Design a protein with these regions (language model features):
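Alpha-helical linker/edge segments of TPR/alpha-solenoid repeat scaffolds
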Residues: 44-54, 133, 137-139, 143, ...
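Amphipathic alpha-helical segments of tetratricopeptide repeats
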Residues: 22-32, 68-75, 79, 108-117, ...
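Residue signature of alpha-solenoid helical repeat architecture, marking inter-repeat boundaries
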Residues: 34, 38-41, 81, 122, ...
Length: 245
């Protein structure tokens, strides 16, 4: 049989990685299918721990490497929950680094395949809103609108978590404002404001109040074309850091 690996302390992470990788090699060489499956499952969690540690330390490159290994192992092990976590974190890390195509790939995989498996409404809201930002940056405003509207419809029917819907309303209002559709912008920012007020989150409420004021001013005086608050990415980053993964 393949060797077993039982690290005794957190400091033994490197040894655990080496041991589980060796365990996988032995199992693979001898076609021990049950041991291979167990090794992949163990590596899934070990790689996840390494990636999360690197992300916390601020080493984006090392974190992405760890999450990539974690994702590969999770897919081989059939662990949909950890695979979803890896897609979400990789998407957010790429987004933070400005790598929109990579962020789009991982966040779309999370939204389409992983959100249901993970069952984390906060992460689901952040992923939808961040993916919409990626689509907007690539010029696909229509795709961004469709994504956000579908998310709001789903969230409104199935969730009491409202930070995600608040950010989605903010994103939709921003898109409509940029397109010159002042009435729709006001409608979305009013909804954003109502949700923000119910949440009692001062940072989100300040953004909602400012954006609604700008949109109403634009509706009354079309020549008043001020920009709405541009700190949505920061709000997304702030909220993502609180996603319960």
């Amino acid at each position: 049989p393949a060797p077993t690996c039982v690290p005794r302390r957190e400091q033994d992470v490197d040894a655990a990685v080496s041991c589980h990788e060796q365990r996988l090699k032995v199992a693979s060489d001898h076609m021990l299918n049950d041991d291979m499956a167990a090794a992949y499952e163990s590596l899934t969690h070990v790689y996840l721990g390494v990636a999360e540690k690197e992300e916390k330390a601020g080493d984006v490159t090392a974190a992405l490497t760890g999450f990539s290994k974690c994702l590969s192992a999770a897919e081989r092990a059939g662990n949909a929950v950890v695979a979803a976590k890896a897609h979400f974190r990789m998407g957010m890390l790429h987004f933070g680094a400005g790598r929109m195509p990579d962020a789009t790939f991982h966040l779309r995989r999370f939204v389409e395949d992983g959100a249901a498996a993970l069952g984390d409404r906060v992460a689901e809201g952040v992923a939808h809103t961040t993916l919409a930002q990626c689509l907007r940056s690539s010029g696909d405003a229509a795709g961004s609108i469709a994504l956000l509207e579908a998310y709001l419809d789903s969230a409104g029917r199935s969730s009491t978590e409202q930070h995600g819907p608040a950010m989605a309303c903010c994103s939709l209002g921003t898109i409509y404002h940029e397109q010159g559709d002042a009435q729709r912008a006001v409608t979305m920012f009013e909804r954003f404001f109502e949700i923000a007020r119910a949440l009692g989150d001062r940072r989100v409420l300040d953004t909602a109040r400012f954006n609604l004021g700008v949109a109403r001013g634009t509706l009354r005086m079309p020549a008043y074309a001020a920009a709405v608050a541009g700190d949505l990415p920061k709000l997304l980053e702030w909220k993502a850091s609180r996603a319960g993964l």
